[in-house]
Amino acid sequence: MGKGGGKGHTPREAKDNLKSTQMMSVIDAIGEGPVEGPVKGLQSILVNKTPLTDTDGYPVIHGVTAVWRAGEQEQTPPEGFESSGAETALGVEVTKAKPVTRTITSANIDRLRVTFGVQSLVETTSKGDRNPSSVRLLIQLERNGHWVTEKDITINGKTTSQYLTSVILNNLPERPFNIRMVRETADSTTDQLQNRTLWSSYTEIIDVKQCYPNTSIVGLQVDAEQFGGQQLTVNYHIRGRIIQVPSNYDPEKRTYSGIWDG
């Protein structure tokens, strides 16, 4: 009597554990100040038509920082918004054989933010299991004619979609200077290993402490990933500029009563 076949193997899929965190940071000028401000606090700030809080003050959108300035002549800089950045999109693949180099010429920048990642990161075994993997990248600056490694990064985990992360480079060389991204991990030559790497963008950052005198502003930081890649819009419900009105005028009811005396 012949032997029966061996037990079949059910392929296992490890959970994706890499998640991009992309923060939208913006300062919106509301108008000439001083103004009274949002009608109902954070409920009067809407991202993609959704208020930041409900009527009881509980968060509807999480991971949000909002800073308000009314527009006085002397007002403090908005905390957490002490820098201004200009992003340059690249979207270029980085391979083992071809590091990617760019030249920075802006004379007044203080720091660089480099955004990079993987298109996907997963390794499939001969039995069909889909497991985490890793890839190593170097970020280098050219100093005195030599490439110097500023960041040595290993991305380790699993994702079936694009994953981006970023690092900040301080202590920059005199301008102009070259920056490059180097892939240390060998390129995949099979569909069983998906680990393509890309340099998404770089952002030139200037450290400033702007007070925006006589201008009412809102500084807003929000985790854009929770909106699934949608373009973000922000709306505000604001009580406007504070001005002098007749003594017999009720600005809430918008009515006059009695005799005007100043």
Language model segments and positions:
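Polar, S/T/G-rich
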Residues: 1-262
